[in-house]
């Protein structure tokens, strides 16, 4: 069974954690931006039906 030889330093752990958090942050920004463009009707890369009431 594979076992790590040395303990991961606190700074390395922090760096990895912030990268992991930033990844999620940018994903939410992209999703919000896409939702906004669909809602306003400015989306050119996403096709959706427009309902008229």
UniProtKB/Swiss-Prot annotation:
GO terms for molecular function: structural constituent of ribosome. Its main location: plastid. GO terms for biological process: translation. The keyword tRNA-binding does not apply. It is found in: Plastid, Chloroplast. One of its GO terms (cellular component) is large ribosomal subunit. Signal peptide: none annotated. InterPro entries: Ribosomal_bL32, Ribosomal_bL32_plant/cyanobact, Ribosomal_zn-bd. It holds the Pfam family Ribosomal_L32p. It comes from the Eukaryota. SUPFAM superfamilies: Zn-binding ribosomal proteins (SSF57829). HAMAP family: Ribosomal_bL32. Belongs to the bacterial ribosomal protein bL32 family. This is Large ribosomal subunit protein bL32c. It comes from Glycine max (Soybean).
């Amino acid at each position: 069974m594979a076992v790590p030889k040395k303990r991961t330093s606190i700074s390395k752990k922090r760096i990895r954690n912030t990268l992991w958090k930033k990844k999620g942050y940018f994903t939410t920004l992209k999703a919000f931006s896409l939702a906004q463009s669909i809602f306003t009707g400015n989306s050119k890369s996403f096709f959706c039906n427009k309902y008229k009431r």
